[in-house]
Structure formats: C-alpha cells, structure tokens
C-alpha cells in the first residue's frame, strides 16, 4: 500500500474509531464536521484517495458506505455484547465478549449484534435464560415491538408501549410488573429491535 498523508491517516483513524465505538462507519458529513472541512465533498475526495491506496472500500449508494478491507477486520461475524458500561455506546468494542459466525441476513431485518438473555421475564414468548437474542440496531420503536432498551443505564429486553410521555416496558411473564418510564424525568434509549433467538447458543 502507498503511504498516507497526515490528513488521510487522520481520516482513517476516525473511521476505525467510529466503527469500534458505534459499530458503524461515519457519514461524509460527520467526517467533514469532526475534521473541520467546509463540505462533505471535501471528505469524499479524501475517501477516494484512501480507497485508491487500498486502505478502505467504498460502497456506493449509502451514506455510510465505507468498509475496511477484510484483512483490517480483526473480528468478523455478529458481536456478542456483554456488560454495558453506563453512558457507553452498546456496540463499543470493550463491550464485545466474542464474535459468532452467524449470517446477519438470516434475520429480518438483519441483525447487528447478539445479546445474552438474563432472567425469565420474556419466557412466555420463548426468550429464555441463556439464549442469544439477535438484535437489529435502531433508535425508535412502535407499540407492541420487543425491544432492547436502556433505562437509566440498565439494559433490558421488553415489549414496548408508549402512551403520551410515558413508556411502559412489558414483561412476557405474569410474575413481573411493567417498567414505567416517565420521559419528563427519566431517560430511555432504544438500542434495537429483537429479530430472533438462538436457543442457548447450542449450535454456535
């Protein structure tokens, strides 16, 4: 590979760090904003130079269409997320316990990460202790969907219901009461949508 200019090296580091912290590459606009470019087009020119030198691959037609070459991807497959630190992105690299060779596209929509189920609060719909829950990363939810939510930095899997400014996170087990979240005084973040279950990881 041809050597990088200091600016190209800075952009490559930004791309790698963004993928490690959020699981996604940055958009052109995000690169321009963080590095002080006047426009996303300036970032695009640097990305083209990085691609020409073989440090990244550009996938047309998507704002985050940047990929590291396969040899740069130390780990592949779906990441299994372990304990999530308060205030940290759920896909931050330090939260990844290991990677499983699971095709994300076997789930609809495609899975972005796996979460190990703790407890039996969702047992009535077949989500059991020790299962691996496949999750599609998203930040909004509709009533009735099973979501991974972060409430005051606790991560939980529940069925979502919103009534005005109040959100109810329902268990699928009569032994558990709903979690009530008043958005006027509490924080709630939707981390993703449950899209499938791998039973106890037996076949992995």
Swiss-Prot record:
Reaction(s) catalysed by this chain's protein: Hydrolysis of Ala-|-Gly bond in repressor LexA
Enzyme active site: 121 (for autocatalytic cleavage activity), 158 (for autocatalytic cleavage activity)
Marked site: Cleavage: 86-87
Classification via Gene3D superfamilies: Umud Fragment, subunit A, Winged helix-like DNA-binding domain superfamily/Winged helix DNA-binding domain
Enzyme Commission number: 3.4.21.88
Residue ranges of the annotated DNA-binding region, renumbered to this chain: 28-48
GO biological process entries: DNA repair; DNA replication; negative regulation of DNA-templated transcription; proteolysis; SOS response
Entries under SUPFAM superfamilies matching the protein: LexA/Signal peptidase, Winged helix' DNA-binding domain
Domain of life, per lineage: Bacteria
Record carries keyword Ribosomal protein: no
Single GO MF annotation: DNA binding
Family recorded in the similarity comment: Belongs to the peptidase S24 family.
Subunit structure: Homodimer.
Role, per record: Represses a number of genes involved in the response to DNA damage (SOS response), including recA and lexA. In the presence of single-stranded DNA, RecA interacts with LexA causing an autocatalytic cleavage which disrupts the DNA-binding part of LexA, leading to derepression of the SOS regulon and eventually DNA repair.
PANTHER family reported in the protein's UniProt record: LEXA REPRESSOR, LEXA REPRESSOR-RELATED
Protein name (database record): LexA repressor
Gene this protein is translated from: lexA
């Amino acid at each position: 590979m041809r050597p990088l200019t200091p600016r190209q090296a800075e952009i490559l580091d930004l791309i790698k760090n963004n993928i490690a912290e959020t699981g996604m590459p940055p958009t052109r606009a995000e690169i321009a904003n963080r590095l002080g470019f006047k426009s996303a087009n300036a970032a695009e020119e640097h990305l083209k130079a990085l691609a020409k030198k073989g440090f990244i691959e550009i996938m047309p037609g998507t704002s985050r269409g940047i990929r590291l070459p396969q040899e740069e991807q130390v780990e592949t497959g779906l990441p299994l997320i372990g304990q999530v630190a308060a205030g940290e992105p759920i896909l931050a690299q330090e939260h990844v316990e290991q990677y499983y060779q699971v095709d994300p596209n076997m789930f609809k929509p495609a899975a972005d990460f796996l979460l190990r189920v703790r407890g039996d609060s969702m047992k009535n719909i077949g989500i059991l202790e020790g299962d691996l829950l496949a999750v599609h990363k998203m930040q909004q939810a509709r009533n009735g969907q099973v979501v991974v939510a972060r409430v005051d930095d606790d991560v939980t899997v529940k069925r979502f219901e919103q009534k005005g400014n109040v959100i109810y996170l329902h268990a699928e087990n009569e032994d558990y009461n709903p979690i009530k979240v008043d958005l006027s005084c509490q924080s709630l973040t939707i981390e993703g949508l449950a899209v499938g279950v791998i039973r106890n990881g037996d076949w992995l």
